[in-house]
From Swiss-Prot:
DNA-binding region: 21-40
Alphabetical GO biological process terms: regulation of DNA-templated transcription
One Pfam family of this chain: TetR_N
UniProt keyword Chaperone present: no
Coiled coil: none
InterPro entries recorded: Homeodomain-like_sf, HTH-type_TetR-like_transc_reg, HTH_TetR, Tet_transcr_reg_TetR-rel_C_sf
GO molecular function: DNA-binding transcription factor activity; transcription cis-regulatory region binding
Keyword Metal-binding tagged: no
Name of this protein: Uncharacterized HTH-type transcriptional regulator YvaF
Keywords from the UniProt entry: DNA-binding, Repressor, Transcription, Transcription regulation
Domain HTH tetR-type: 1-58
């Protein structure tokens, strides 16, 4: 039942944001609020559990990419920059603001994860520099540029939202950040 509760809560968050009620959740599950409160003493505790499950899923994706021996270090960075944000698609700016406003402790947990999440990417970028797979750039600046780009994608007012899938946009962002905008011949001439 616990997994069903978390899955339905996640669905309701996507549908209604964090304004869903425990009544909404009980009705969607065909159970009573009493049953819900047997598993979670409050909506805050339930939201915290959803955030923790979400973080665990993102860490598993990251671990799978990091441990994939068929990928070189540069491919691992690219995969992380494309795959992880797709998993975080639920977290648009509106939902993050709601989470911060109504479930502050859960927001703190998620915020800490989002900030620390870049440690592995930074380590991989530094490894790429050492292996001369990328130019001598500032990895922190690269990550901030990337975060700024993906924040635009998750903005509800993002103008290209309906023209491209999130995956297509993320792949384009990573392509531009890794390869720039000049054609190979032009890059060779400069």
């Amino acid at each position: 039942m616990d997994k069903r509760i978390l899955a339905e809560t996640f669905r309701l968050i996507k549908q209604k944001g964090f304004s869903f009620t425990m009544n909404d959740l009980a009705a969607a599950l065909g159970t009573s609020k009493r049953t819900l409160y047997a598993y979670y003493s409050s909506k805050d505790q339930l939201v915290e559990a959803v955030v923790e499950q979400f973080i665990a899923e993102m860490k598993q994706i990251e671990r799978d990419i990091y441990e994939n021996e068929s990928l070189n270090v540069l491919e691992k960075v690219k995969q992380m920059l494309i795959s992880l944000p797709q998993g975080m698609e639920l977290l648009n700016m509106g939902l993050l603001n709601e989470l911060k406003k109504y479930h502050y402790d859960a927001w703190l947990t998620l915020d800490a994860f989002i900030k620390e999440e870049w440690a592995i990417v930074l380590a991989l970028l530094n490894e790429c520099k050492q292996q001369k797979r990328i130019r001598n750039i500032n990895p922190d600046l690269f990550v901030h540029m990337y975060i700024g780009s993906i924040n635009q994608v998750y903005d509800p007012e993002y103008p290209l939202k309906h023209q491209f899938t999130t995956g297509e946009v993320l792949e384009s962002i990573v392509d531009v950040l890794f390869n720039g905008i000049t054609a190979d011949e032009e890059a060779d001439a400069t």
